[in-house]
Amino acid sequence: NYKNLVISESAVIRLFVIATTVILLSIITGIVLSIRKAKKSNDKVWNVSSKRLVINFGIPLVTGGFFIVFLIEKEILSLVAPLTLLFYGLACVNASKYTLGDVRYLGITMIVLGLLSTWFLGYGLLFWALGFGVCHIVYGSMMYFKYDRN
């Protein structure tokens, strides 16, 4: 029950450190894999299209991140899980214009999961597992078999 949930300040700091670490490791992994792929195909990693991709992905994601931090500060915790899915989905849809069009479908799926998670408050971890776990595994597998498999 989110109404009776009390989180100590040290727990909030630990959760923030964990979340920041996961985000940074995800970004670093994405950059490393992009550099490797670009080198294999003799492409530039940083060009006009990649700059637009980062900007269009970053604006909704960073906005959502700040919004969620403000909600946590106000102890409105019930919306944290749904909003992470929702803003990530919006970022994917917004960035899909500058990358594979299939990213749009991942984004729409995340938006739907975020809205469902808002409707079914209290099941945020389940929706996180579906969105950030199952959907990414399925999406990654589909992209591998569609574009990268030799």
Where do the language-model regions lie?
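Phenylalanine-focused residue identity feature
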Residues: 16, 57, 66-70, 87, ...
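Membrane-proximal helix-loop-helix units in multi-pass membrane proteins
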Residues: 44-103
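Selected alpha-helical membrane-embedding segments in polytopic membrane proteins
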Residues: 1-65, 69
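Terminal transmembrane helical module of multi-pass membrane proteins
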Residues: 91-150
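Membrane-interfacial segments
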Residues: 37-42, 71-75, 146-150
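Membrane-water interface of alpha-helical transmembrane segments
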Residues: 9-17, 75-78, 82, 97-107, ...
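Lipid-exposed faces of alpha-helical membrane segments in multi-pass integral membrane proteins
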Residues: 21-25, 29, 59, 63, ...
